Amino acid sequence: MSAKWEKKGTNDGVLTFSIEQAVIEKGLTQAFNKVKKNLNVPGFRKGKVSRTVFNRMYGEEALYEDALNAVLPEAYEAAVLEAGIEPVAQPKIDVESMNKGEDWVITAEVTVKPEVKLGEYKNLTVSKQDREVTDEDVEARLKREQESQAELVIKEDAAAENGDTVVIDFEGFLGDEAFEGGKGENYSLELGSNSFIPGFEDQLVGKKAGEEVEVNVTFPEDYQAEDLAGKEAVFKVTVHEVKAKELPELDDEFAKDVDDSVESLDELKEKFRKELTEAKEAAAEEAKDEEAIRLAVENAEIVELPHVMVHDEVHRSMDEFLNNMQRQGISPEMYYQLTGSTEEDLHKQFEGEAETRTKTNLVIEAVAKAENIEVTQEDIDAEVKDLAEQYNMPEAQVRKVLNNDMLEHDIRMKRAVETITETAVEK
């Protein structure tokens, strides 16, 4: 095997390599064994013709294509290793020569990972994060819990106020014609929740049960239903009931109803404070880590990102997003219809994020290389054990899903990230 790498562009080049006679012969044997199974030759039983007879009748060249397909993947991988390059996409293969009795010469047009010139990535200065939990934070959490425990009580002959819930029938019209999706019966709407079109809820404030009212609105220009976007509409609304929230008393009984592990309101407040502190600490650490990584990426220099890397990352993001939609019962076609968008729009939406993620991954890989981060088999075994416990599955199953190379790469990336984040200083 001899391999030669010739750079043609920032991230592109041509890899020329040869396939030796011994390897070619192995490929020819595989190709012949595949072909002869279905070969009918006079004087021979089906599939029993000899290689010599085949070559005399059809010529050895008839096997070249299948032979090349058999040996090319391994030969290409060996050439890549010898040349010391890291391809990021499938190569475009061309045959330079396939002469009998000579090594075959192959060329491959290859896109490789771009060069990353690291800047500062250790001891980076990041913004000081807010980790303090105040009494106001605890009271706000308590208030949310109180709101969630509230009961709705009918207001007899009383006008609706913001915060009240009205039970309504409604039907929307464009001019004199009702439009699809604009009708509802016995719908509970909290006034001030902004869950309806802007202006709709405001016009129900002050109304009482039994009243009928016409609500005039204008749909937003960016409304998801294109046939309604920017248009004026009238909703005929009947108010059936007006309900007010009745909040429970903030006392020890309330505390025990919320959490049976506490005996008093003070205990509940302390538990909330602890939970809020843990959450704020986790959020602060995450924000610190994200800023440190962002700075490390900004400090690095990548002349040009290969388009194919960004393209692949976009499609990974799109597939993940659409699969999540599918799990919620929304097909891609339905999503595009509901949002008035196209596959191309979604592609553009993910492009910026994909470019950032691609740059970030390249910089983290470069840090791992610069730090000479090594991963042992013991490290891999420990990672498999952790993943098996985390996902409650046998270790053997983890190894089936993630091979050693994938696990080694993940561990190296984690340690490179830790090199950046654990040395960052808040100021």
Swiss-Prot record:
Q: Which keywords, in A-to-Z order, does the entry hold?
A: Cell cycle, Cell division, Chaperone, Cytoplasm, Isomerase, Rotamase
Q: Output the Gene Ontology terms for molecular function.
A: peptidyl-prolyl cis-trans isomerase activity; protein folding chaperone; ribosome binding
GO biological process annotation, one example: protein transport
Is this entry keyworded S-adenosyl-L-methionine? no
* Record-annotated PPIase FKBP-type domain positions: 163-248
GO CC terms on record? cytoplasm
Q: Does the keyword S-adenosyl-L-methionine apply?
A: no
Q: Which reaction does it catalyse?
A: [protein]-peptidylproline (omega=180) = [protein]-peptidylproline (omega=0)
Its chief place of residence is cytoplasm
Q: What is its EC number?
A: 5.2.1.8
Looking up PANTHER family in the UniProt record yields: TRIGGER FACTOR CHAPERONE AND PEPTIDYL-PROLYL CIS/TRANS ISOMERASE, TRIGGER FACTOR-LIKE PROTEIN TIG, CHLOROPLASTIC
Protein name, per record = Trigger factor
Instruction: Name the source organism.
Output: Enterococcus faecalis (strain ATCC 700802 / V583)
Q: Identify the gene encoding this protein.
A: tig
